[in-house]
Amino acid sequence: MKHPFPQFPPILVIYCFCMLQIPSSGASPPLAGPPDGLDAVDPERLAHFLNQRETCSNQPKESRDVYKRFLFHYSRAWKSTHPVNSEFAPVHPLMRLAAKLPSRRMKRLPRLLHTDSRMATIDFPKKDPTTSLGRPFFLFRPRNGRYTDKVQ
């Protein structure tokens, strides 16, 4: 089997010789038009492209300015139109209403149990201290099963 490597250099030399353009006068003639497959660059299109590129480079600065305006508009540094109550911590308004729920519940319960209503009166049994095994009554369970007083 013959190796293709010894034949490779002569083929390369022939290919390069065929592709070489030897001008007769010693200087190559200037191109009359753009080579095939390449478009000539229009100066107006080039200026438009460069202008767009410049505006894209300024875009982070503009977005930074918009962000600063947003922060300035929504910051509490300026004087607000509504007076801010300083005794309350800044919490959601519904959380402020949650503190008023037990008192509203207690006001509504006697109305429901009123004798004029058609509902039957409900007697709530009172807790005696023996049923709670000496533990105080908690609205919520103590964390991790711990008791407030050391009862074991």
From Swiss-Prot:
Subcellular location: Secreted
Family: Belongs to the NmU family.
Propeptide regions on this chain: 27-69, 70-105, 106-108, 147-152
Entry-linked PANTHER family: NEUROMEDIN-S
UniProt-listed GO biological process terms: locomotor rhythm; neuropeptide signaling pathway
Gene Ontology molecular function: G protein-coupled receptor binding
Segment forming the signal sequence: 1-26
Post-translational modification Asparagine amide, affected residues: N144
PROSITE patterns: NMU (PS00967)
Stimuli inducing this protein: Expression has a diurnal peak under light/dark cycling, but remains stable under constant darkness.
Assigned keywords, A-Z: Amidation, Cleavage on pair of basic residues, Neuropeptide, Secreted, Signal
A Gene Ontology cellular-component term: extracellular region
Purpose of the protein: Implicated in the regulation of circadian rhythms through autocrine and/or paracrine actions. Stimulates the contraction of rectum and elevation of blood pressure.
InterPro entries membership: Neuromedin-U_amidation-site, NmS
Protein name, entry field: Neuromedin-S
Top-level taxon: Eukaryota
Tissue localization of expression: Expressed in the CNS, spleen and testis. Specifically expressed in the suprachiasmatic nuclei (SCN) of the hypothalamus.
